[in-house]
Amino acid sequence: MTQSTFSFNIAFTQSVNPPDQTVVLSATELWYGIRRGGRNPHDFAPYVASCEVLSGTQNEFCRKLTLADGAVHTAAGEDLIQDVIIAPPLHVQAKTVTTGATSTFLLSHGTAAKEDNERPELFLTAMYELKLDNVKPGTQAAKDIEFNYTALARGACDNAVRDIRKWKTEGKLAAWQREAEQDGAGVSNKGEILPYKD
C-alpha cells in the first residue's frame, strides 16, 4: 500500500502602508525587498543558515539552502535544493526539487480607483505549499506541523515587511536598486520593468 503525501497550504497577507505607519514603502521599494529573498533568503528567514546559487539566470535559478534551527520539518544543517522563479515586479517563488513544496512572496496592489502616490495601497502575501512523504495525514505529527507551519508563515509575512522597511531606513534598498539597474535587472525608479540580462 502506498503512503499518501501529506500536504498543507497556508497564506498570509499584510497591508504594507497602514495609516499609522511613518516609513512608507513604494511599490518599487517593496519589490526590491521581496526580490532580495530570491538569492538571500537568510536575510528574511532565521531558519535559513546560508544560500548558494548553483546555476541559472537572474530571474530563474537553482539554489541550495542550508537550514538553521527553527525550521518546522527539517533539521539544522540539512540542505534543500530549490528552483527559483522571479517574476518582476510580482513575485519570488521557490520550489523544493525533491518534494514540490513551494513558497511564494507576492506583491499586490489595492483596488482603489486612484493610486495614492504618498501612501500607495500595497500588500505582501506569503504563500506556503508544504508537501512531505514521511508524515501521515491526520496524525498528531501532521497536526503539529500544521500548527507550527502556520506560525512560521505568519511570522514570515510580518517579518518580511518589517525587514524591508528597516532596509529602506538603512539605505540598503536604494543601494540594491542601483546595483540591479546597473546590471540591467529589475524595475526602474519610474516603476518600469527593466529587461533582464542572462
What are these regions (language model features)?
Residues 53-100:
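Glycine-rich portal/gate segments that line the openings of hydrophobic small-molecule binding cavities
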Residues 16-18, 67-71, 128-134:
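Beta-strand elements of well-folded, non-transmembrane domains
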Residues 140-197:
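A conserved amphipathic terminal alpha-helix motif
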Residues 10-12, 63, 82, 122-124:
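Hydrophobic residues positioned within well-ordered beta-strands of beta-sheet architectures
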Residues 19-20, 113-116, 171-175:
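Alpha-helix termini
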